[in-house]
């Protein structure tokens, strides 16, 4: 273990490894502060379950457009650098909203202001996630490709540790601290992340379009370059002739025009780079072997209404479960997630993705049935406590969700064509996040339609029954997944 860490330090440097671990730890530790947000919406603002779910859906939308951040950072350098300036910007966007919400009572007492600040905060977090992923990809490519898996393992481990710590401390903090204090405490991590950005050195980037996308746009680039060269040459000849007549005045005008030309050329390069990246990404995504599986994963999210926020209200209001216990339940969920990852990697990689996804959806329906048992109070008749049901359901639900998510990760990674893996993978993750967002909107709409609100959960059982039925809708579209694809092969 120590030897392995020394190898990573030698390959990537302490500063880079520290930044990677800190960013991913912060991503996991977000459960510490977002639990407080849930209680702020429920207890302080007294929003209904559907209204709270709507706020969360809007606030997490920035995670659905991650490729946009990647393309911009790839194509438009700031100060000659493509990564660290954007990492600084994203960290500031992550830091400032929590400071404002912690210090200003008006901002956290208005659902609109709170939603805006939470959206800005998620914009910063999503951008930081994209930038650090790009930095990892570049570091692996420039240093040692053999450490690619190791670096990913370090990042996932850091996020898991952050998730466990955030869930444990979040429940304790809510029982002993004010919500605004929790917001302020969380700012320590983004502030530390901001300082850590100064430790990482980045080489100046050239201002040329993305090399991996140039091949697919070679003809357009050549034609644009040739068309631009002719007027530029004639203009420079004209300036030289005028300069011979006008002397020093002509020289100064020539310098001014040269500077304008260079600025225009730089802007043109940025535009062409953005254009190449966008069109290259679009062409790759439109290939049936990529489009069809991604369509299935999107359908799998939007056809199943997400009632997690409604269940949170039910657990706190009807079952009277406190914040400390719910934090423990989230820790158990993280352990279930890691267990699901182990089970898939150890036993299910050779299973076809169609079969593993079918079993995953059957398992998801079972977890919803457990919620139905909890809502019907049938567990009490058999001597099973509510806390036992919640803990078991949390572990099982997160494990099964991970069994469903692992095929998505594997298929996404294997379908990405060489050269644009990072940006296309970010697009895949954005589709997954967008599907989650739409599913949350669907859940909010279902709760509103059934009249489920704070203090009124009479139709909760009906909502869960509808959710169980919807869980099997994506099974009808499994033909979109490659028939023989497994965790080892995507073909």
UniProtKB/Swiss-Prot annotation:
The keyword Membrane applies. Signal peptide: none annotated. InterPro entries: BT1 (IPR039309), FBT (IPR004324), MFS_trans_sf (IPR036259). GO terms for cellular component: membrane. It is a multi-pass membrane protein. It is found in: Membrane. The chain crosses the membrane at residues 14-34, 52-72, 84-104, 112-132, 154-174, 179-199, 294-314, 323-343, 356-376, 389-411, 437-457, 461-481. Residues 237-248 have a biased composition (Basic residues). It comes from the Eukaryota. The keyword Repeat does not apply. Pfam families: BT1 (PF03092). Residues 224-236 have a biased composition (Polar residues). Belongs to the major facilitator superfamily. Folate-biopterin transporter (TC 2.A.71) family. Could mediate folate transport. This is Probable folate-biopterin transporter 4. It comes from Arabidopsis thaliana (Mouse-ear cress).
């Amino acid at each position: 273990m120590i030897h392995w860490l020394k190898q990573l330090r030698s390959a990537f440097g302490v500063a880079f490894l520290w930044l990677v671990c800190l960013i991913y730890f912060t991503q996991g530790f977000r459960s510490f502060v977002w639990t407080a947000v849930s209680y702020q919406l429920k207890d302080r603002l007294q929003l209904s379950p559907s209204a709270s779910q709507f706020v969360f859906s809007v606030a997490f939308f920035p995670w659905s457009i991650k490729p946009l951040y990647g393309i911009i950072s790839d194509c438009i350098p700031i100060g000659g650098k493509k990564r660290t300036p954007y990492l600084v910007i994203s960290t500031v966007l992550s830091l400032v909203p929590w400071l404002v919400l912690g210090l200003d009572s008006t901002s956290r007492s208005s659902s609109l202001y709170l939603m805006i600040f939470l959206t800005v905060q998620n914009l910063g977090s999503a951008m930081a996630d994209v930038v650090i992923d790009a930095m990892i990809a570049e570091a692996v490519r420039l240093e040692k490709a053999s450490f690619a898996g190791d670096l990913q393992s370090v990042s996932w481990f850091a996020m898991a540790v952050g998730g466990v710590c955030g869930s444990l401390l979040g429940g304790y903090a809510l029982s002993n601290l004010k919500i605004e204090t929790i917001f302020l405490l969380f700012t320590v991590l983004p502030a530390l992340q901001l300082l850590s950005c100064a430790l990482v050195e980045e080489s100046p980037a050239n201002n040329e379009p993305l090399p991996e996308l140039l091949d697919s746009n070679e003809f357009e680039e050549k034609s644009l370059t040739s068309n631009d060269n002719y007027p530029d040459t004639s203009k420079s000849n004209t300036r030289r002739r005028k300069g011979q007549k006008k002397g020093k005045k002509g020289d100064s005008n020539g310098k001014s025009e040269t500077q304008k030309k260079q600025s225009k050329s730089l802007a043109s390069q940025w535009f062409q780079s953005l254009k190449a990246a966008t069109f290259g990404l679009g062409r790759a995504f439109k290939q049936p072997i990529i489009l069809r599986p991604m369509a299935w994963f999107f359908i799998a999210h939007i056809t199943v209404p997400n009632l997690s926020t409604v269940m949170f209200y039910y657990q706190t209001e009807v079952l009277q479960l406190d914040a400390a216990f719910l934090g423990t339940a989230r820790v158990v969920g993280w352990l279930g997630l890691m267990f699901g990852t182990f089970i898939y990697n150890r036993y299910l990689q050779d299973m076809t993705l169609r079969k593993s996804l079918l079993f995953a959806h059957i398992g998801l329906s079972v977890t919803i049935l457990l919620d139905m048992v909890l809502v019907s109070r049938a567990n009490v008749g058999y001597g099973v406590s509510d806390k036992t049901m919640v803990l078991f359901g949390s572990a099982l639900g997160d494990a099964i969700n991970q069994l469903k998510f692992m095929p998505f990760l594997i298929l996404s990674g294997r379908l990405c064509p060489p050269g644009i893996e990072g940006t296309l993978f970010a697009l895949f993750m954005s589709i997954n996040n967008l599907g989650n967002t739409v599913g949350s909107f669907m859940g909010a709409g279902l709760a509103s339609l059934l009249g489920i609100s704070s203090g009124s959960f009479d139709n909760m059982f009906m909502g869960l029954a509808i959710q169980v039925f919807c869980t099997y809708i994506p099974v009808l579209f499994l033909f979109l997944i490659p028939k023989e694809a497994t965790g080892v092969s995507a073909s």
